[in-house]
């Protein structure tokens, strides 16, 4: 079965098409009369009742958008939910990664593929977020120097991007979590996942500040430091710097880790 699925999507992608959509991301495969058939997750398809609700709430939210670009983003996303066409999703993803104005942003769709052993099928997730402007000064220092980090990365030069495009990084507060992001999201996210979009248009990185703060506070007083840290001076250093350096580690991971390097095959 695995071989059949891989061959099914390989035929869709074709040879040498670097800008092929992420085939399989929003569908279920089943067999009918011995042939593989793809059932799309759309407003009028599989899971249509739930997707109708997603579309309905997106359209209600649209009137509260901060600018015309955000309204356009919602139009593109709604179109994708209605057509199920992954080229529509790519058009939405390109517009999303280029939209930086305003305090509010969102992630919405069948995006992450961690739950699929073949790395094809997306799980639905949603976040509504707003910027932490003070903490974002930290991440923007990193993103504004992304080219320097790329040029000095200790990897084979073939994997370095000659020109880093569109790498942005913000610290945000999650106002809403849904789908696989609920009840506990990842503390950092970098999207979109399509390599060709990242190469040509860039990526967005976020560190979810109110979640990392909550996790850090929940871990206080659990006895770990008293039991395992060697002395009071080290405990004092950890109390002073551990949380901020942990956040900085997430910033570096999302912005410079996911946002860097290129496929050698492009060379």
Regions found by a protein language model. Give the residues of each.
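Contiguous, non-catalytic segments that form substrate-binding/exosite surfaces or channel walls
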Residues: 1-30, 34-238, 242, 246
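Catalytic Zn2+-binding segment of zinc metalloproteases
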Residues: 255-266
